[in-house]
Swiss-Prot record:
It catalyses: di-trans,octa-cis-undecaprenyl diphosphate + H2O = di-trans,octa-cis-undecaprenyl phosphate + phosphate + H(+). Belongs to the UppP family. This is Undecaprenyl-diphosphatase. GO terms for biological process: cell wall organization; peptidoglycan biosynthetic process; peptidoglycan metabolic process; regulation of cell shape; response to antibiotic. It holds the Pfam family BacA. GO terms for molecular function: undecaprenyl-diphosphatase activity. Keywords: Antibiotic resistance, Cell inner membrane, Cell membrane, Cell shape, Cell wall biogenesis/degradation, Hydrolase, Membrane, Peptidoglycan synthesis, Transmembrane, Transmembrane helix. It is a multi-pass membrane protein. The chain crosses the membrane at residues 13-35, 45-62, 82-102, 108-128, 186-206, 219-239, 250-270. It is found in: Cell inner membrane. InterPro entries: UppP (IPR003824). The keyword Transmembrane applies.
Length: 273
């Protein structure tokens, strides 16, 4: 394998892992960064691999929690509610994605839409943080979430179908807006990422498996490992961060990044293939 291609695959995996769980839109970062470094994968298999690497970072970080849930399923009330809440939160975006995913990609997957959603999302985060600073959150533990709370987070996740919104951003801010404490909303967003991303990965594999070749294995493994490691770092770092601080820095970053996308696009530095 060419060293430069390997390096680019490594960098793309790192970008996916670092941005997937932050409220800053991993999709926007992958497209912009891929254009800037000249990395153009021939098919979806590489993207599927790095997404899977990122989601497995959450499974690894919370392996004890998931193990307890699996062993307690059907017997333990907390485990049953946890799975029920994930299922409820999963459904809205899954249904809307199946119904309108093709149209969303056709009409909204462009620099202007992504940039606008990044900027609007940044201002939305500022508003939610200001609102929560004035009110005491009602729910401060994932195990205290009710099915109605999970449903509201699931409804918020529907907005993440629009490129540039950020899945983690929509679920975390949706949870906080509903009265869930910042760290609790963040953790539930991590947990919800597992069924959402596994389902999306399985769907993409069924659609694109025929494009897989043994020639791609090396790059796929490099991207997968990079996404797993960087995803693990991002999850740990974000949990520490939100234990003491708020999401306002990410809001400003989104606004600046959204404006930067427009500038890069208009100047011809990035394309949107």
């Amino acid at each position: 394998m060419d060293f430069l291609i390997v390096l680019k695959a490594l960098m793309m995996g790192l970008v996916e892992g670092f941005t997937e769980f932050l409220p800053i839109s991993s999709t926007g970062h992958l497209i912009v960064f891929g254009n800037l470094i000249g990395f153009h994968s021939n098919h979806k298999v590489f993207e599927i691999a790095i997404q899977l690497g990122a989601v497995l970072a959450v499974v690894f970080e919370y392996r004890q929690r998931f193990s307890n849930v699996l062993h307690g399923l059907g017997k333990d009330r907390k485990a049953n509610r946890f799975v029920l809440n994930l299922a409820i939160a999963f459904i809205p975006a899954a249904v809307m994605g199946l119904l309108f995913g093709k149209q969303i990609k056709e009409y909204l997957f462009n620099p202007l839409s992504v940039a606008v959603m990044l900027v609007l999302g940044g201002f939305f985060i500022l508003w939610v943080e200001k609102r929560q600073s004035r009110a005491e959150p009602k729910i401060a533990d994932v195990d205290a979430l009710r099915p109605i709370d999970a449903l509201m987070i699931g409804v918020a996740q529907v907005f993440a179908l629009v490129p540039g919104t950020s899945r983690s951003g929509s679920t975390i801010m949706g949870g906080m807006l509903w009265g869930i404490e910042r760290k609790t909303a963040t953790e539930f967003s991590f947990f919800l990422a597992v069924p959402m991303m596994v389902a999306a990965t399985a769907y993409d594999v069924l659609k694109h498996y025929r494009f897989f070749t043994l020639h791609d294995v090396g790059l796929i493994l490099i991207g997968f490992i990079a996404a797993f490691v960087s995803g693990l770092v991002a999850v740990k770092a974000l949990l520490r961060f939100v234990s003491k601080k708020n999401y306002i820095p990410f809001a400003y970053y989104r606004i600046v990044f959204g404006i930067a996308i427009i500038i890069l696009w208009l100047s011809g530095w990035i394309s949107w293939e």
